[in-house]
């Protein structure tokens, strides 16, 4: 391989490094004594070599060097061409291909150079005055916060002994279940700064319900004693599911970037389609940096809740203003109509010069429903988002709740949530909702939707009787629907060719199922089934197409849990057994034997005196013949049945049991992984098998080990310096 110049060689090595996942540095170069031209150059990984520092250094800085040998050595031939003299490929550390753009050597500053007058920020200029920093991958954004000593005193505020309590909690949870994930962040002074964790069931829930995630900071912003933030989703029973917890030191871009990165690693790199947050510039910058493909939306209820704090003379014209504002927000059919009404509104109430109103308009695509066509919030919008999120911890977290009390309540909260979901699953298996009309839409969705969603959809079907529609024009596809229930008119656009329907009430966007206005238009158009693209799988009984099964029999001690466990195993057995005639024969044989043994056991329990007779006369309820083919008579010994990596038989080893205290032992209902994860269980890094493709460990978000933890547990932290981005008002 040849290069025209040594700079071309370095660009090649940089491109290679970015694709593999490490940062680069120019290690050395040499010039000819005669011609003064470069004749030799060596490029390396940024972790090449070892740290050299004076013993009397006042403010020692962390160094990334850990003795890595990866490098490329190039030399110049007499004809002027450069060639590779030596190349070392192996690294002594993990590579980060997904996060490679964060390395200093891979950040593109061309946009800054070409647009210097708009993007360059003078020293001490507030970050809120900077613009055009949305393309974080292409700008030197993260390093733009400058490595300085601003974060030296920032740490997680804890009471005496809380650090040990927190560490013990994290290690116990991971000991109970190896798929429990956690990560910690330390300052350069070895102070505990940020903590993140998510339980095994939260990771499994995210696989099925990753479309919409709410990031909740109300406890943190309200200055609770426990600086708690939450990642929350919603399952197919419209129950909140906890997708991660964080304890944060401050409200800065750095903190939120670290948190989002840690959460993304825990979730195997799977990014949500939509993330709902409160209006916050630091969170906005972090999501744009870590989750650029995710649609970031503000909670509309939170936006409206800020009106009294940001507008003068609010009480003088509150009713009139809100009426006009709601008309603009909820009754604007198009983006142009929204803009027109907004400008008319701020002129009428003399709000053009109010900075908050200007910023609100500039960010209208983050919160205004008119700009969110095609997005589904799964019910996590408006006030119901706040109520759903707060319902997780409202019984366990109060302003003065200590960390110890919170961790104890955490186990109880998990137990409550798992019981509620198990009960809803049981109801779904055990009974069907009642039909309340002869509507074909109701019959269609009876066994498709989960019970809670069906009941809500059923109200829309019944409400269609109170709607009257008129066509806006003979040639058009837009209908005006008068809803006599709320005395409002709605516009419905129906494209029969594309099976695309849209209502101005935006029920589908907010809730994930069609409204009564859309239903009456479909009905009057001769369409009597809900178009498939408006039946979200997340709301159906098939939301989890492969159920997690508990291997520990101690987790299945009630009729409800036993019933759910057997039903889920039967589904997996059906999937595997139907793949071939041989697997079908094996499954049938196993079921026959199971029926016989169950009959004997039940008869023994009911009639102990006749147990021997019951064992002989127990019938076989399974038909002998396979209606799809012949059944083999030579089955052989009972096999071990597997579904993916899920063993059918219980593990022989005893799983270690522990709990936070005597009152939270039942928190062990966390769904157990069916694959033993790989990674350190002795330190702060663990990524299980399903997520190894990311090649990222939680420990990579750490810096150095504080003394308070060194005697408690063996750790293997890598000394990676943190980028200091401690500003809570980043460019927007």
UniProtKB/Swiss-Prot annotation:
Cellular component GO terms held in the UniProt record: nucleus
InterPro entries per UniProt: FAR1_DNA_bnd_dom, FHY3/FAR1, MULE_transposase_dom, Znf_PMZ, Znf_SWIM
Subcellular location as annotated: Nucleus
Domain FAR1: 11-97
Induction description: Up-regulated in hypocotyls by far-red light treatment.
GO BP annotations listed: regulation of DNA-templated transcription
Taxonomy, superkingdom: Eukaryota
Segments of skewed composition (Polar residues): 624-635
Span of zinc fingers (SWIM-type): 490-526
MULE domain ranges (all copies): 212-308
Tissues with expression: Expressed in hypocotyls, rosette and cauline leaves, inflorescences stems, flowers and siliques.
Keywords: Metal-binding, Nucleus, Zinc, Zinc-finger
Main function: Putative transcription activator involved in regulating light control of development.
Xref: PANTHER family: PROTEIN FAR1-RELATED SEQUENCE 10-RELATED (PTHR31669), PROTEIN FAR1-RELATED SEQUENCE 4 (PTHR31669:SF42)
UniProt similarity note: Belongs to the FHY3/FAR1 family.
Protein's name in the database: Protein FAR1-RELATED SEQUENCE 4
Organism of this sequence: Arabidopsis thaliana
Lineage: Eukaryota, Viridiplantae, Streptophyta, Embryophyta, Tracheophyta
């Amino acid at each position: 391989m040849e290069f025209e110049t040594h700079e071309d060689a370095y660009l090649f090595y940089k491109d290679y490094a970015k694709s593999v996942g490490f940062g680069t540095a120019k290690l050395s170069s040499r010039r000819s004594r005669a011609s003064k031209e470069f004749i030799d150059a060596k490029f390396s990984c940024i972790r090449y070599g070892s740290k050299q520092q004076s013993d009397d250094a006042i403010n020692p800085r962390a160094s990334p060097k850990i003795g890595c040998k990866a490098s490329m050595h190039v030399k110049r031939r007499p004809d002027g061409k450069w060639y590779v003299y030596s190349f070392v490929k192996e690294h002594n550390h993990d590579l980060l291909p997904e996060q490679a753009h964060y390395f200093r050597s891979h950040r593109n500053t061309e946009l800054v150079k070409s647009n210097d007058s708009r993007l360059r920020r003078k020293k001490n200029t507030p970050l809120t005055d900077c613009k055009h920093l949305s393309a974080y991958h292409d700008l030197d954004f993260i390093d733009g916060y400058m490595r300085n000593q601003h974060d030296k005193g920032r740490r997680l505020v804890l009471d005496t002994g809380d650090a040990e309590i927190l560490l013990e909690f994290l290690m116990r949870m991971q000991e109970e279940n190896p798929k429990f994930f956690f990560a910690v962040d330390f300052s350069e002074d070895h102070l505990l700064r940020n903590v993140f964790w998510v339980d095994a069931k939260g990771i499994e829930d995210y696989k099925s319900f990753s479309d919409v995630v709410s990031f909740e900071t109300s406890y943190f912003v309200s200055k609770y004693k426990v600086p708690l933030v939450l990642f929350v989703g919603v399952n197919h029973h419209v129950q909140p599911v906890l997708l991660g917890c964080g304890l944060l030191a401050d409200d800065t871009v750095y903190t939120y970037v670290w948190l989002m990165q840690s959460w993304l690693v825990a979730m195997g790199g799977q990014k949500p389609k939509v993330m709902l947050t409160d209006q916050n510039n630091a969170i906005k910058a972090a999501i744009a940096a870590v989750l650029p493909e995710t649609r970031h939306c503000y909670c509309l209820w939170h936006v409206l809740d800020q009106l009294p704090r940001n507008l003068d003379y609010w009480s003088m014209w509150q009713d009139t203003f809100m009426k006009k504002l709601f008309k603009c927000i909820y009754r604007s059919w198009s983006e142009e109509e929204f803009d027109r009404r907004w400008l008319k509104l701020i002129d009428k109430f003399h709000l053009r010069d109010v900075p908050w109103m200007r910023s609100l308009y500039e960010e209208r695509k983050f919160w205004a429903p008119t700009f969110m066509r095609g997005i589904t919030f799964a019910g996590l919008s408006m006030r119901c988002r706040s109520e759903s999120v707060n319902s997780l911890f409202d019984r366990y977290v109060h302003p003065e709740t200590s960390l110890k009390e919170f961790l104890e309540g955490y186990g109880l909260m998990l137990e409550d949530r798992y019981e509620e979901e198990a009960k809803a699953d049981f109801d779904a298996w055990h009974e069907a909702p009642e039909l309340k009309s002869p509507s074909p839409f109701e019959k269609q969705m009876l066994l498709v939707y989960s019970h809670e969603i069906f009941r809500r959809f059923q109200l829309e079907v019944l409400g269609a009787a109170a709607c009257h529609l008129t066509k806006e024009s003979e040639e058009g596809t837009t209908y005006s629907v008068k809803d006599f229930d709320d005395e409002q008119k709605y516009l419905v656009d129906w494209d029969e060719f594309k099976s695309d329907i849209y209502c101005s009430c935006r029920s589908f966007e907010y809730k994930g199922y069609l409204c009564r206005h859309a239903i009456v238009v479909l009905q009057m158009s001769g369409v009597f089934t809900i178009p498939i693209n408006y039946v979200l799988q997340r709301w159906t009984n098939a939301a989890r197409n492969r159920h997690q099964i508990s291997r520990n029999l101690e987790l299945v001690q009630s009729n409800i849990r036993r019933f759910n466990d057997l039903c889920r195993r039967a589904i997996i057995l059906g999937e595997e057994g139907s793949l071939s005639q041989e697997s079908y024969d094996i499954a049938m044989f196993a079921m026959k034997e199971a029926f016989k043994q169950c009959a004997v056991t039940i008869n023994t329990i009911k009639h102990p005196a006749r147990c021997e007779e019951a064992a002989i006369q127990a019938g076989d309820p399974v038909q002998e013949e396979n209606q799809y083919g012949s059944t083999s008579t030579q089955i052989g010994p009972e096999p071990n049945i597997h579904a993916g990596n899920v063993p059918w038989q219980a593990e022989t080893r005893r799983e270690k049991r522990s709990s936070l205290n005597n009152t939270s032992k039942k928190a062990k209902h966390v769904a157990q992984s069916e694959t033993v994860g790989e990674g350190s269980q002795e330190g702060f890094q663990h990524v299980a098998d399903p997520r190894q493709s990311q090649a990222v460990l939680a420990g990579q978000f750490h810096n150095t080990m504080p003394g308070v933890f060194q005697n408690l547990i063996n750790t293997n932290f890598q000394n990676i310096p943190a980028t200091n981005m401690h500003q809570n008002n980043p460019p927007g």
